[in-house]
Amino acid sequence: MTISYDEEFSSLMLRWRGSIWKAVLKDLIGFYIAYYIVLAFQWYLLDEKGKEYFTGWIMWCEIGAQYIPLSFLLGFFVSLIVARWWEQFNCISWPDKMMIMVSACLPGNENMVVRQTIARWSSLQAAIAWSGVSVKTLKRFPTERHMVASKLMTEEEYDLYMNTDAPHGKWFIPILWIVNLIKKQKQKGIIDSIQMDMLLKQVYSYRDGFAMLFVYDWIKIPLVYTQVVAIATYGYFFICLIGRQPKLDQRSMEKEITILFPIFTTFQMLFYLGWLKVGQYLMNPFGEDDDDFELNYVLDRNTAIAHMMASELSDQLPSIGAPMVPAVPHTRASFKIQDVIPKSHLAGFKLSEAEMKLIKPEDLEEHERLMEETKVTNRQRLGTLVRALEKKSRTNATINEDDEE
């Protein structure tokens, strides 16, 4: 079940379900047990020479642990898993748009049975398809007889479904029943070609979500990458069993502070193992972990919504004519926290009166004349400046010749 939370930060850290504490507790306890076994071996069973030799192993493991690119591996792995997790959620099919189109194209009490049948088959489609990817839905509908008992499938539909030979799966059969029912309404003249096309587009869109979930269930994250990340993480902390031990030889105890509890290693385990557990839990979001998707709830919700749209909401229309007010009132609570009205970054930009004056054709001619006069004046000034520079250059050259003589 997806865990919701909106408490303050201090209360959030004390949550258990779906928390980091629950995710890493067993691994943390196992690490502490192994850590203190190694510490007891070093403390009680090694003499001074053995402790000096063991200190060399500690230093060697400390250096070796730095060569494992754990942050890079976990960062890329979890980013891939989270993106895939959200994409799978977006593949969950919702019948709302399809049932809205069904209600629009098949109105009236005379089409009530057709609308309700399409609604029921949409829920049957979800129950069959999700039973193939979700453990929770499979436990709810372990066999097709359970769908008959749940009134999602009739005995006739059960016989048709079971007698269909489909070696590559038959989860799509209810969708075909919906398509055939729409075709029948077209043949009867109840809907036209345009309405049929709009209905079929919604049915195809509804079907695509189930197909993509089967694709995600089929194509997993490559096993070799999952193994690399798991081996790197657990291998890192296996090295830390020795590399983070206190140095108990006489020389080291005189120079360094000896701390018997692995404080910083504990923080690393919370971060790195918590990171790894996120990827492991989200890799299959249709299992039974705390943060897995509740497809049983989605099925209940979709069934109720589809039934409402097919029956009591299909032709419901309140009376019209009530005037619309230009402003929606606030409560005292919402009035205190009104949002700042967004403004364009050019809202305060203003031009002067001269800049806002419109340019007329005669103004353009006058402007071009003035520009031409300005160019002529500039050329004259430039020519005068060049001649002055040449004259000064000749004068300087003459002075230099006189000095040489």
From Swiss-Prot:
Keywords on record: Membrane, Transmembrane, Transmembrane helix
Transmembrane regions listed in the UniProt entry: 28-48, 63-83, 223-243, 256-276
MF GO annotations: chloride channel activity
Positions in coiled-coil regions: none
Keyword presence, Transmembrane: yes
GO cellular component: membrane
Mode of membrane association: Multi-pass membrane protein
Family matches, as InterPro entries: Bestrophin, Bestrophin-like
Disulfide-linked positions: none
Protein name: Bestrophin homolog 14
Organism: Caenorhabditis elegans
